């Protein structure tokens, strides 16, 4: 860590829970962010600002006018430009001292597994069930911690899932690929709510990477109308085809 790093990250380094050792861990880490929408853009901003050494930014979509209500990395001038490339450009302006890789593709199959294998933490910021399930399966197979979130209306949810998966995985809670009846396309979403959830994904990633204990194995639910939180304990499903031990299928 050089003098420039010390000055840039000085407000984090002052924290006993992070200090120089924790900051160096962040600088040496790689985070894969899949989905650069309402969740992924605030998460990416805070992780870049915090000095995570390598951010891999994956999204196959372009910026649309309807995104601008909540996807805070983008401006009107970015409409029809690839989200991954715009994100890389904006984050470089924020922190030119980190490595930023743009993947303008929908990660799936071997490409997904390769990206997960190189990451220290994966942030699932996607918006469809099939993709979430595939990300979860890859993370479990490769023992990569997964931080997943979603938001619709005034509500959000967050999970931190870590090896050895004693509290289960995403499929334990949602055992099939059926899409929820309500999503932001059909029911809408309040921008700050999805921002809260994406920011918390960044916070949990910083904690994991710097060695701060974090409560894993909980489904945390946020009600934006009442500003209330509640947590539900997760339990591994004995017959889970992803994390269920001898019952698990190979990925």
From Swiss-Prot:
Coiled-coil segments on the chain, per record: none
Residues in cross-link Glycyl cysteine dithioester (Cys-Gly) (interchain with G-Cter in ThiS): 184
Catalytic activity annotation: [ThiS sulfur-carrier protein]-C-terminal Gly-Gly + ATP + H(+) = [ThiS sulfur-carrier protein]-C-terminal Gly-Gly-AMP + diphosphate
Enzyme category, top tier: transferase
SUPFAM superfamilies: Activating enzymes of the ubiquitin-like proteins
Cofactor(s) essential for the protein: Zn(2+)
GO molecular function, one term: ubiquitin-like modifier activating enzyme activity
Recorded superkingdom: Bacteria
Positions contributing to ATP binding: 11, 38, 59, 70, 83, 107, 127-131
Pfam families (alphabetical): ThiF
Active site: 184 (glycyl persulfide ester intermediate)
One GO CC term on file: cytosol
Alphabetical list of InterPro entries matching this protein: Adenyl_ThiF, ThiF/MoeB/HesA, ThiF_NAD_FAD-bd, Ubiquitin-activating_enz
Result for mutant: residue 184 to S: No cross-link formed with ThiS. No effect on ThiS thiocarboxylate formation in vitro. Does not support growth
Residues that bind Zn(2+): 169, 172, 240, 243
GO terms classed as biological process: thiamine biosynthetic process; thiamine diphosphate biosynthetic process; thiazole biosynthetic process
Biological or metabolic pathway of the protein: Cofactor biosynthesis; thiamine diphosphate biosynthesis
Quaternary structure (record): Homodimer.
The name this protein goes by in its record: Sulfur carrier protein ThiS adenylyltransferase
Gene: thiF
